[in-house]
Protein backbone atom coordinates (compact mmCIF):
# COMPACT_ATOMS: atom_id res chain seq x y z
CA UNK A 1 0.00 0.00 0.00
CA UNK A 2 1.14 3.50 -0.84
CA UNK A 3 1.66 6.08 1.89
CA UNK A 4 1.52 9.85 1.74
CA UNK A 5 2.07 12.78 4.08
CA UNK A 6 -0.51 15.48 4.74
CA UNK A 7 0.29 18.67 6.62
CA UNK A 8 -2.46 20.99 7.77
CA UNK A 9 -0.61 24.30 7.70
CA UNK A 10 -0.85 27.03 10.36
CA UNK A 11 -3.79 28.81 8.70
CA UNK A 12 -5.79 25.56 8.71
CA UNK A 13 -4.94 24.68 12.31
CA UNK A 14 -5.63 28.23 13.52
CA UNK A 15 -9.08 28.13 11.89
CA UNK A 16 -9.92 24.74 13.45
CA UNK A 17 -9.93 22.84 10.15
CA UNK A 18 -7.69 19.84 10.97
CA UNK A 19 -10.58 17.51 11.78
CA UNK A 20 -12.54 18.44 8.66
CA UNK A 21 -9.51 17.96 6.41
CA UNK A 22 -8.54 14.62 7.97
CA UNK A 23 -12.15 13.48 7.60
CA UNK A 24 -12.17 14.38 3.91
CA UNK A 25 -9.13 12.17 3.36
CA UNK A 26 -10.67 9.26 5.25
CA UNK A 27 -13.81 9.58 3.11
CA UNK A 28 -11.59 8.92 0.08
CA UNK A 29 -10.93 5.47 1.52
CA UNK A 30 -7.47 6.41 2.81
CA UNK A 31 -6.48 4.97 6.17
CA UNK A 32 -5.01 7.31 8.81
CA UNK A 33 -1.95 5.56 10.26
CA UNK A 34 -0.04 8.42 11.90
CA UNK A 35 -1.04 11.73 13.47
CA UNK A 36 0.65 14.46 15.49
CA UNK A 37 0.58 18.18 16.11
CA UNK A 38 3.78 20.15 16.31
CA UNK A 39 5.37 23.53 15.92
CA UNK A 40 7.73 23.20 12.96
CA UNK A 41 11.08 24.89 13.53
CA UNK A 42 13.32 26.42 10.85
CA UNK A 43 15.60 23.36 10.72
CA UNK A 44 12.73 20.97 9.98
CA UNK A 45 11.16 23.46 7.55
CA UNK A 46 14.47 23.74 5.69
CA UNK A 47 14.70 19.94 5.38
CA UNK A 48 11.07 19.56 4.36
CA UNK A 49 11.10 22.33 1.76
CA UNK A 50 14.70 21.72 0.56
CA UNK A 51 13.60 21.28 -3.09
CA UNK A 52 12.37 24.91 -3.01
CA UNK A 53 15.52 26.36 -1.39
CA UNK A 54 16.63 28.25 -4.53
CA UNK A 55 13.20 29.71 -5.25
CA UNK A 56 12.44 33.35 -4.40
CA UNK A 57 9.52 32.43 -2.10
CA UNK A 58 11.53 30.02 0.08
CA UNK A 59 12.21 32.43 2.97
CA UNK A 60 8.53 33.47 3.14
CA UNK A 61 7.48 29.81 3.02
CA UNK A 62 9.71 28.93 5.99
CA UNK A 63 8.49 31.98 7.92
CA UNK A 64 4.87 31.01 7.28
CA UNK A 65 5.15 27.27 8.04
CA UNK A 66 6.94 28.04 11.34
CA UNK A 67 4.44 30.76 12.34
CA UNK A 68 2.05 28.43 14.17
CA UNK A 69 1.21 24.81 14.89
CA UNK A 70 0.69 22.24 12.15
CA UNK A 71 -1.02 18.87 12.03
CA UNK A 72 1.04 16.12 10.39
CA UNK A 73 -0.71 12.96 9.22
CA UNK A 74 0.21 9.84 7.29
CA UNK A 75 -2.41 8.15 5.16
CA UNK A 76 -2.18 4.79 3.47
CA UNK A 77 -4.11 3.33 0.57
CA UNK A 78 -4.15 2.47 -3.10
CA UNK A 79 -2.91 5.46 -5.11
CA UNK A 80 -2.79 7.48 -1.88
CA UNK A 81 -0.61 10.27 -3.31
CA UNK A 82 -2.79 10.82 -6.37
CA UNK A 83 -6.07 10.63 -4.44
CA UNK A 84 -4.89 13.11 -1.84
CA UNK A 85 -3.46 15.57 -4.35
CA UNK A 86 -6.69 15.55 -6.34
CA UNK A 87 -8.70 16.16 -3.14
CA UNK A 88 -6.37 19.01 -2.12
CA UNK A 89 -6.79 20.93 -5.38
CA UNK A 90 -4.42 23.32 -7.14
CA UNK A 91 -1.70 25.06 -5.11
CA UNK A 92 -3.41 28.42 -5.63
CA UNK A 93 -6.86 28.31 -3.99
CA UNK A 94 -8.12 30.83 -6.58
CA UNK A 95 -7.45 28.19 -9.25
CA UNK A 96 -8.79 25.24 -7.22
CA UNK A 97 -12.15 23.70 -7.97
CA UNK A 98 -14.92 23.94 -5.39
CA UNK A 99 -15.15 20.69 -3.48
CA UNK A 100 -11.37 20.50 -3.04
CA UNK A 101 -9.70 21.38 0.26
CA UNK A 102 -7.97 24.44 -1.15
CA UNK A 103 -10.93 25.48 -3.28
CA UNK A 104 -13.21 25.42 -0.24
CA UNK A 105 -10.83 26.38 2.58
CA UNK A 106 -7.66 27.97 1.19
CA UNK A 107 -7.03 31.69 1.66
CA UNK A 108 -4.33 32.48 -0.91
CA UNK A 109 -1.33 30.86 -2.58
CA UNK A 110 0.75 31.06 0.62
CA UNK A 111 -1.99 30.27 3.11
CA UNK A 112 -3.33 27.37 1.07
CA UNK A 113 -4.16 25.28 4.13
CA UNK A 114 -2.49 21.96 3.25
CA UNK A 115 0.65 20.29 1.95
CA UNK A 116 0.63 16.82 0.43
CA UNK A 117 3.44 14.69 -0.94
CA UNK A 118 3.78 14.99 -4.72
CA UNK A 119 5.10 11.47 -5.38
CA UNK A 120 5.40 8.13 -3.60
CA UNK A 121 9.18 8.56 -3.48
CA UNK A 122 8.96 12.03 -1.92
CA UNK A 123 6.29 10.76 0.48
CA UNK A 124 8.76 8.25 1.95
CA UNK A 125 11.29 11.00 2.59
CA UNK A 126 8.74 13.48 3.95
CA UNK A 127 7.14 10.92 6.25
CA UNK A 128 10.57 10.09 7.70
CA UNK A 129 11.05 13.75 8.67
CA UNK A 130 7.93 13.73 10.86
CA UNK A 131 7.44 10.12 12.00
CA UNK A 132 9.50 7.10 12.95
CA UNK A 133 8.25 3.78 11.59
CA UNK A 134 7.23 2.77 15.14
CA UNK A 135 4.83 5.76 15.28
CA UNK A 136 2.85 4.48 12.28
CA UNK A 137 0.07 2.09 13.21
CA UNK A 138 -0.92 -0.93 11.15
CA UNK A 139 -4.55 -2.01 11.60
CA UNK A 140 -7.46 -3.36 9.60
CA UNK A 141 -9.92 -0.65 8.68
CA UNK A 142 -13.50 -1.90 8.73
UniProtKB/Swiss-Prot annotation:
Cofactor: Mg(2+)
SMART domains on file: NDK
Cellular location(s): Cytoplasm
Active site: 115 (pros-phosphohistidine intermediate)
Residues where ATP binds: 9, 57, 85, 91, 102, 112
InterPro entries: NDK-like_dom, NDK-like_dom_sf, Nucleoside_diP_kinase
Entries under Pfam families matching the protein: NDK
Keyword Iron: no
EC number annotated for this UniProt entry: 2.7.4.6
Any one biological process term the GO annotation gives: UTP biosynthetic process
Main subcellular location: cytoplasm
Keywords for this protein: ATP-binding, Cytoplasm, Kinase, Magnesium, Metal-binding, Nucleotide metabolism, Nucleotide-binding, Phosphoprotein, Transferase
Presence of keyword Cell inner membrane: no
GO cellular component, one term: cytoplasm
Domain of life, per lineage: Bacteria
MF terms in GO: ATP binding; metal ion binding; nucleoside diphosphate kinase activity
Catalytically driven reaction(s): a 2'-deoxyribonucleoside 5'-diphosphate + ATP = a 2'-deoxyribonucleoside 5'-triphosphate + ADP; a ribonucleoside 5'-diphosphate + ATP = a ribonucleoside 5'-triphosphate + ADP
Subunit composition and interactions: Homotetramer.
Function description: Major role in the synthesis of nucleoside triphosphates other than ATP. The ATP gamma phosphate is transferred to the NDP beta phosphate via a ping-pong mechanism, using a phosphorylated active-site intermediate.
Entry-linked HAMAP family: NDP_kinase
PANTHER family documented for this protein: NUCLEOSIDE DIPHOSPHATE KINASE (PTHR11349)
UniProt similarity note: Belongs to the NDK family.
Protein name: Nucleoside diphosphate kinase
Gene this chain is encoded by: ndk
